């Protein structure tokens, strides 16, 4: 223990809390067994005293004395168990705090290592580089999307050529004679068709003469283009 407090191997210091916890638990377990044994002995002596209380007072008295001795030992054992359990709880809590501190320390070291790779100035420089590259990409995109060849055309020359074309079109219209108004074509009156007797299709043919009249009518219509 003194080596743990004032020096000694680091690995031993690391394992000492765990070892102390294990030993305390084992000792408490042993004391609990001892307490159970004393409680059994107290019960036996109490039963023996009750058995001889009327027939043999000397045996009953000796049994009570042994019972008192066992009860005194039981009280000491229970006090020891209480002390060890209190100490065990404290050590477990301290060990838990130690493990928590170790985890927090490792987390702090990890953050320190991460932040060691960059700082505020490096972040600002990186953001400036990003903005510069974005602007460059926009310029490149604009240059690529610009029509090829149109930048070499003279706008004044185009306006002059357009004015010449308009002047030529104006002169051409002045030189072209006015066209005569179209004369409406008078169509000849259609020749009226003679009235023909209506033929009842549902009525059966009365005679061969009616069939001949029907054939003549069809021939006349075909001749007239109807």
Curated annotation (Swiss-Prot):
Residues 18-177 form a coiled coil. Residues 164-226 are annotated as: Disordered. Its main location: cytoplasm. The keyword Ribonucleoprotein does not apply. It is a peripheral membrane protein. One of its GO terms (cellular component) is ESCRT III complex. It is found in: Cytoplasm; Endosome membrane. InterPro entries: Snf7_fam. It holds the Pfam family Snf7. Required for the sorting and concentration of proteins resulting in the entry of these proteins into the invaginating vesicles of the multivesicular body (MVB). Also required for the proteolytic cleavage of the transcription factor RIM101 in response to alkaline ambient pH. This is Vacuolar-sorting protein SNF7. It comes from Debaryomyces hansenii (strain ATCC 36239 / CBS 767 / BCRC 21394 / JCM 1990 / NBRC 0083 / IGC 2968) (Yeast). The lineage of its organism: Eukaryota, Fungi, Dikarya, Ascomycota, Saccharomycotina. The gene is SNF7.
């Amino acid at each position: 223990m003194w080596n743990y407090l004032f020096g000694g191997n680091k690995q031993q210091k690391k394992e000492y809390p765990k070892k102390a916890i294990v030993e305390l638990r084992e000792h408490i377990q042993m004391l609990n067994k001892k307490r159970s044994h004393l409680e059994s002995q107290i019960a036996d002596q109490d039963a023996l005293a009750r058995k001889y209380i009327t027939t043999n007072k000397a045996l009953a008295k000796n049994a009570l004395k042994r019972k008192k001795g066992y009860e005194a030992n039981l009280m000491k054992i229970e006090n020891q168990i209480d002390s060890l359990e209190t100490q065990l709880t404290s050590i477990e809590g301290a060990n838990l705090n130690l493990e928590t501190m170790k985890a927090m320390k490792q987390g702090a070291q990890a953050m320190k290592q991460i932040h060691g790779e960059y700082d505020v100035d490096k972040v600002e420089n990186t953001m400036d580089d990003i903005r510069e590259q974005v602007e460059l990409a926009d310029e490149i995109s604009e240059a690529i999307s610009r029509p090829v060849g149109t930048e070499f055309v003279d706008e004044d020359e185009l306006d002059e050529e357009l004015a010449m074309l308009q002047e030529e079109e104006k002169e051409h219209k002045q030189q072209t004679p006015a066209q005569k108004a179209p004369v409406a074509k008078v169509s000849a009156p259609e020749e009226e068709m003679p009235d023909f007797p209506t033929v009842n299709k549902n009525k059966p043919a009365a005679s061969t003469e009616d069939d001949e009249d029907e054939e003549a009518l069809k021939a006349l219509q075909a001749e007239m283009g109807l």
